[in-house]
Amino acid sequence: MMMARKQDVRIPTYNISVVGLSGTEKEKGQCGIGKSCLCNRFVRPSADEFHLDHTSVLSTSDFGGRVVNNDHFLYWGEVSRSLEDCVECKMHIVEQTEFIDDQTFQPHRSTALQPYIKRAAATKLASAEKLMYFCTDQLGLEQDFEQKQMPDGKLLIDGFLLGIDVSRGMNRNFDDQLKFVSNLYNQLAKTKKPIVVVLTKCDEGVERYIRDAHTFALSKKNLQVVETSARSNVNVDLAFSTLVQLIDKSRGKTKIIPYFEALKQQSQQIATAKDKYEWLVSRIVKNHNENWLSVSRKMQASPEYQDYVYLEGTQKAKKLFLQHIHRLKHEHIERRRKLYLAALPLAFEALIPNLDEIDHLSCIKTKKLLETKPEFLKWFVVLEETPWDATSHIDNMENERIPFDLMDTVPAEQLYEAHLEKLRNERKRAEMRRAFKENLETSPFITPGKPWEEARSFIMNEDFYQWLEESVYMDIYGKHQKQIIDKAKEEFQELLLEYSELFYELELDAKPSKEKMGVIQDVLGEEQRFKALQKLQAERDALILKHIHFVYHPTKETCPSCPACVDAKIEHLISSRFIRPSDRNQKNSLSDPNIDRINLVILGKDGLARELANEIRALCTNDDKYVIDGKMYELSLRPIEGNVRLPVNSFQTPTFQPHGCLCLYNSKESLSYVVESIEKSRESTLGRRDNHLVHLPLTLILVNKRGDTSGETLHSLIQQGQQIASKLQCVFLDPASAGIGYGRNINEKQISQVLKGLLDSKRNLNLVSSTASIKDLADVDLRIVMCLMCGDPFSADDILFPVLQSQTCKSSHCGSNNSVLLELPIGLHKKRIELSILSYHSSFSIRKSRLVHGYIVFYSAKRKASLAMLRAFLCEVQDIIPIQLVALTDGAIDVLDNDLSREQLSEGEEIAQEIDGRFTSIPCSQPQHKLEIFHPFFKDVVDKKNIIEATHMYDNAAEACSTTEEVFNSPRAGSPLCNSNLQDSEEDIEPPSYSLFREDTSLPSLSKDHSKLSMELEGNDGLSFIMSNFESKLNNKVPPPVKPKPPVQFDITKGDLSYLDQGHRDGQRKSVSSSTWLPPDGFDPSDYAEPMDAVVKPRNEEENIYSVPHDSTQGKIITIRNINKAQSNGSGNGSDSEMDTSSLERGRKVSIVSKPVLYRTRCSRLGRFASYRTSFSVGSDDELGPIRKKEEDQASQGYKGDNAVIPYETDEDPRRRNILRSLRRNTKKPKPKPRPSITKATWESNYFGVPLTTVVTPEKPIPVFIERCIEYIEATGLSTEGIYRVSGNKSEMESLQRQFDQDHNLDLAEKDFTVNTVAGAMKSFFSELPDPLVPYNMQIDLVEAHKINDREQKLHALKEVLKKFPKENHEVFKYVISHLNKVSHNNKVNLMTSENLSICFWPTLMRPDFSTMDALTATRTYQTIIELFIQQCPFFFHNRPISEPPGATPSSPSAVASTVPFLTSTPVTSQPSPPQSPPPTPQSPMQALLPSQLQAEHTL
């Protein structure tokens, strides 16, 4: 377009021609000067549209194409640009070149035959239909590119860009190029058009060439030079804009920027765009598996992406993307590598934890060793392709196993070396710990209680400090101290038991005197076990006081062997063996309308009662209902805070009959209020017929809301409360008691315990009052007490098995869990024997207060404390009561090898000889003895029955004589049996908190014999009348249950017996001032009779004399007098002849016998500490009451000692004398010899008896021992008849366990163990676990699920409970049940059905707590649950459908007996047991667990 049209408003258009060196290779060299690249960059500046290669060698066809169009110039197209002054313009770009024929390598012939210099200077260009040029690829493929023609087919050139290549061109001389350029410039100058020199390829420029080019330009007038680089896109636009400015003089002059400055700006622009683009890529691309195609589509619209692609091109953008992907992949691989390297030490610990195995192996050998391990594939994976980071394994996120080729890397080798070093250090530290512990155990300087500071210098050395911190040694030392202290305490407790005679001789009470404590320390002071606790004197004294409390207040809770107290074991055994009487009387109990109602009095001043009542009501439901053991009870509270004599504060009202009372105090004043209120309440009801408040159950509670358990005031209140509780015979709770919470008076657990105790009291009252019980009790012929020592190394189950499993053994009707009834043939007749099985400490309280016909006393031959307790017990037993001593041994071998056993056996036999008792020994390891061994003893008891009963009745009758006439005549008067509720000696001030011996068993069976004997007495208008009334009361009056001792003290001098004389003379009885029974504290334990022929001088007081026909066929009468029942009505003389005369008057021959004495006087081995008994005043140590002292003073005035003679009044009819019916026969029976037994060795195991979690691992969830046993049984014993039922040899089982404990790789088949031995050892493993395999909390859920009636729902519920098992328990349980299921499939051969197996296994797997009634009644449920697990094993553990039951499953014990071969063969008739109740007696779970040999022994 002509410049003349510039004035047009249209956008100005400029035509620019780019010229420079062109021609053949000879002229220009191997490459051009960059004219095409310059044009390309300016016309299409985007990096993707920029092409570096533009060839000038064309074929004829390409030369003739529409793009070249047979011309030696190229039309690059039209470009719009905004110049510096923001004026837009258009530019048509033409490049003058010279195309070479690709065949002749000569310039193509064209319409213009001029040389290049002249053609390039042409200002008028014409070429019809010539197309715009893009790149070389366009030639021949014009249709694939945009087709845009040169406007009008012609152009008028407005200016020239003269290009000079300043790079080092191949085969080109720069000087020659400069000459060519000079000639071309001269030609261009002739056109008068603007010219701008463009230096191309400055990015590769040579400094001299650039300088020469500038020199050339300076030599020309106004010739401007622009340094450019088309490849780097530097100053390209500047060159064209400079030319446009020269063309259009009106435009401002363009500033020419040097190349390096422009390059810096361009580089900064590219760097900024690159940063933005990389940020965009990092934000979008997170996974190294992303591909460019999908990511570029996501970035297409992003300006960061567009700017960078414009500047650098798509390829560079892709390259950056690939670099980012590579970086992500590298980071991913490194993360995986770190995970693998972190897991590698764990793999080493799991696969090669034994240092001895790898200590001397190289890394290569270790790799081979790892591959041989069974769990190798659990930790490692061997890849087919290596290395692992170049395979797809890096993307396998689910597989966390370590690639095995990682072991070849340096970090893995370093970790292996670190593992080796760690094992070596651990071994050394373990050696140091072991050496330190051995040092502790062997050092004589380490004693219990020695502080670490004192012990450190004796046991520490430099090696210890080098390997372990001192804190580690202190921890080991602390544990060692705890062990030796616990051991010393146990040994000291055993020492106290070995001196039981001392404690009982001292007659200690709740507050022993300093003198008696001094005696104890003097006696025990030389014992090494006493000295062992010399640094723990406070704890030693506490143990002594605790033992004194046990002696003074013996209960199951205070027993040193608690919770393994014999009483608890006996209750469990008997309750498991029989249905309890309370169950049989349940219907009668339910008939009581008040059975579900509890009336509770809360006594406490200053708001204590109201506050506790509010707390209890807060625990109740909205309608004052309280839940106890799942049953709802109506709770009625009566808080009392004022004077109880007022009707408004009375304990009972016409509508409120209290069942118990909670007494609260927090100060001395409130405690005094409680005592005064209780005494007033009892006094107000004294003498009433409904006098039940005297025996109201009481609980004394110290309220301490602040939770402070220290301080002198609090300790003083506790001591005073304990003393008051002792006097009131009630339970005491102090702030330190379990269950008392901070800020509260009492918590829900404690409330439940109190209410349960009240319910038990109500039930016992109803039970004792039942008519059936009285009838049964009256039919008992003999009452025998069997005494066992708590803590003896024998099983009560084995000792009592012949008794409880005997066919003649029945449940006692007294409601006691400590007694049974036996019907045994003794002599010519069967006798009903009530056998009470008690601990020694429970038996002490009944020696003088209960009627007992004989004692069977057991002791362990290898335990000193056992024989010591026996000696202490026998000291206070009357010598008329037969004694059977039973020594328990470990067998003949043990007796021969053990000096202690021999000595104790010998001593027991000597004691038996000296007291005319019987002696036998029983081997504990072979408890196959029968009741026949006691028959000689029972015969002795029958022979001495009359004198025992008469002596006991005389003691009660003598006390009964002090009551008023109203007592004997009133049908509602208290029975003399009530005296048995009170203790006879000071050591029994506080009775046990649980009833061990029935109060109604003292005398009722005497009536049959004594009513007959009393008819033989002549002229029995005196004492005989009283006796007949007394016996009548025994037959008709039912005694109440155990009642607390009344707080009122009595003086024996009030018991005036002179009314006996008045009754004979005046025909009437004189009432006594006291209308209450004499308490046992009112007479001396030596109130027995002695022979009349011992009286040799006149008596100044009358004595009680009574006689009983010795033998009616021989006419013998034994006359015995009491030396201590003094009369108050004058004195007289008497002689032996008078006694003989009175006897001869009845025509009877008199035989004289001695007074009953205690066994301590007959045996030299008993009462070795008797001297201490007389060293101190009889009675309470620090609280000796004035009444007791007065009694002693009065007693000492008339006579002293057992042999003192009391004057006897001679006048009056001898028929008024008191008569004792007694018969004394002394016989000696042959003593059975003990049978030998096998000694059981013991060892400490690190495998058996430890928690299950210690013998399993996540990799090996089944204990190795169980796995070996089951594999052996399934391989050899599935066809064994009675597998798991027939017991293996005990010694072999122990040998198996011991050998396995030493070598876990033990081969059972090689050792030739029997199947039954292996089976028994496997069951023993589960029995010895600290917790049962089926956890206790899961057992509750299982029982609840079992209650569901629908079978399918029940099984699904059980399966849900099974999922809650701890993982270790679940895996082992699944393994065992699956094995039992397999065993049951062979039941046709082995006779072990799923039911039989469940009977054998449920106690082993569940081990329920039989101390609760719920557990006892659920035993059948437990067995059924295990049976279901075995039957439905595929359903429970292997996701199989529920299988149908195999035929009719026995639902009753009788059915069980028909299918289980090892149950008793005795015919049994029983009804199916109701749900949640124990099975009938013959098929109780305990019986099923006992050896079959013993169960067959029912017939005696």
From Swiss-Prot:
Keywords of the record: Cell membrane, Cell projection, Cytoplasm, Cytoskeleton, DNA-binding, GTP-binding, GTPase activation, Lipid-binding, Membrane, Nucleotide-binding, Nucleus, Phosphoprotein, Repeat, Repressor, Transcription, Transcription regulation
Binding site for GTP: 28, 33-37, 52, 56, 95-97, 201-203, 229-231
Transmembrane segments: none
Positions of the UniProt region annotated as Required for phospholipid binding and regulation of the substrate preference: 1214-1237
Residue numbers marked as site, Arginine finger: R1285
PTM characteristics: Phosphorylation of Tyr-1106 by PTK6 promotes the association with RASA1, inactivating RHOA while activating RAS. Phosphorylation at Tyr-308 by PDGFRA inhibits binding to GTF2I. Phosphorylated by PRKCA at Ser-1222 and Thr-1227, induces relocalization from the cytoplasm to regions of plasma membrane ruffling and prevents the binding and substrate specificity regulation by phospholipids. In brain, phosphorylated by FYN and SRC. During focal adhesion formation, phosphorylated by MAPK1 and MAPK3 at the C-terminal region, probably at Ser-1452, Ser-1477, Thr-1481 and Ser-1484.
Disordered: annotated span: 970-989, 1058-1090, 1125-1147, 1178-1208, 1444-1500
Compositionally biased region (Pro residues): 1472-1483
Residue ranges of domain pG2 pseudoGTPase in the record: 783-947
Phosphothreonine modified-residue sites: T1227, T1481
Domain Rho-GAP: 1250-1437
Free-text tissue specificity from the UniProt record: Strongly expressed in retina (photoreceptor layer) and brain. Expression is maximal in the occipital, frontal, temporal lobe and also the cerebellum. Medium expression in the medulla and also in kidney, lung, liver, heart and spleen.
GO CC terms of this entry: actin cytoskeleton; ciliary basal body; cytosol; nucleus; plasma membrane
Positions carrying Phosphotyrosine: Y308, Y1088, Y1106
PANTHER family from the UniProt entry: RHO GTPASE-ACTIVATING PROTEIN 190 (PTHR46005), RHO GTPASE-ACTIVATING PROTEIN 35 (PTHR46005:SF1)
Protein name in the entry: Rho GTPase-activating protein 35
Lineage per the UniProt record: Eukaryota, Metazoa, Chordata, Craniata, Vertebrata
